[in-house]
Swiss-Prot record:
HAMAP family: tRNA_modifying_YgfZ
Family (UniProt): Belongs to the tRNA-modifying YgfZ family.
Name recorded for this polypeptide: tRNA-modifying protein YgfZ
Keyword Membrane part of the UniProt annotation: no
The protein's role, per its UniProt record: Folate-binding protein involved in regulating the level of ATP-DnaA and in the modification of some tRNAs. It is probably a key factor in regulatory networks that act via tRNA modification, such as initiation of chromosomal replication.
Length: 330
């Protein structure tokens, strides 16, 4: 079967209702880092402890400015003889320029990889479908597997799913093998699963706006508070040790007449009135009409708070529990 990226769009589904689905990830971009100074350089740029990152693990970390605000978050992992990371395509150019600023003084090459194909595999029996294609698959304990020219990443949240960094030839073989049993969908389905997982989505509209803790990166093991210096470290540490962070990422569910855009605010009900608050990171309307919104709000909100999409009197949004704990931040 001939394939073209992006795959034809369908309304996305929650993980509990998702059939086997092959997902094109056109809204994400891949960057590679190679060279003898790659570990040392990255260690001084991102919030995670790169020196301690095993070859079979991946991590969601922040790349911050001097004030501790994230240019982007990065899904970072080993690939080949170097590192690679995934980020939203909308922030690629600006974030890449920032992380390359001081690379001229180091022995490494940082570059966007426009040749690699990014695919997601999720839904019913995703593991069984891939088992017939690859020699070995990652799991919760060994999250990254290299199979020839393909790097496979495993995600446990919100349910087992896989991300493939591969070649056009392997992607074509995969589509050809699975297209009769799998649905095809575009990257909005992967975005929806990230919202359900509580993984913060940083697009261009929100670049440079949030410290990592405001998007729950500390709860996702994306911040090391014991590693050496990195850009923005002082502000990130102050937010933890002085309790300076007053925000958190929330998952809202409900209905609305429209899907809010990144960087919009939402409205919180206070008595008979509504007050604008927060910042939308991402949102998706599911196949059943339900609206999901990922939003940064004050971290002391009551669990039964009533919210709505801005200027939409018909909208109703409620807080859904995330699949991980923020207890250590409270």
């Amino acid at each position: 079967m001939a394939y073209k990226i992006p795959f034809p769009p369908r309304q996305p589904s929650a993980s509990s209702h998702l059939p086997l689905t092959l997902i094109s990830l056109e809204d994400w971009a891949l960057v590679t880092l190679n060279g003898p100074d790659r570990v040392k350089y990255l260690q001084g740029q991102v919030t995670a402890d790169i020196e301690a990152l095993p070859a079979d693990s991946h991590v969601l970390c922040g790349h911050c400015d001097a004030k501790g605000k994230m240019w982007s978050n990065l899904r970072l992992f080993h690939r080949g003889e170097g590192f690679a990371y995934l980020e939203r395509r909308s922030v690629l150019d600006s974030q890449l320029a920032e992380i390359k600023k001081y690379a001229v003084f180091s022995k490494l090459t940082i570059a966007a990889d426009s040749e690699a194909v990014l695919l997601g595999v999720a839904g019913f029996q995703a593991r069984a479908a891939l088992a017939g294609v690859f020699n070995s698959l990652p799991d919760a304990e060994h999250q990254v597997v290299q199979d020839g020219e393909t790097t496979l990443l495993h995600f446990s949240l919100p349910a087992e799913r896989f991300l493939l960094v591969t070649t056009a030839a392997v992607a074509e073989q995969l589509v050809d093998k699975l297209h009769e049993q799998a649905e095809l969908n575009d990257s909005q389905q992967w975005l929806t699963l990230d919202i359900e997982a509580g993984y913060p989505v940083i697009d261009a509209a929100n670049s440079g706006q949030f410290i990592p803790q405001a998007t729950n990166l500390q709860a996702l093991d994306g911040i090391s508070f014991s590693k050496g210096c990195y850009t923005g470290q002082e502000m990130v540490a102050r937010a933890k040790f002085r309790g300076a962070n007053k925000r958190a990422l929330y998952w809202l569910e409900g209905k609305a007449g429209r899907v809010p855009q990144a960087a919009e605010d939402v409205e919180l009900q206070l008595g008979e009135n509504w007050r604008r608050t927060g910042t939308v990171l991402s949102a998706a309307r599911l196949a059943d009409g339900t609206l999901w919104v990922q939003v940064v709000l004050n971290n002391d909100l009551d669990a039964d708070s009533k919210l709505r999409v801005r200027d939409d009197a018909t909208s109703q949004l409620a807080i859904k529990p995330l699949p991980y704990s923020l207890a250590e931040e409270k």
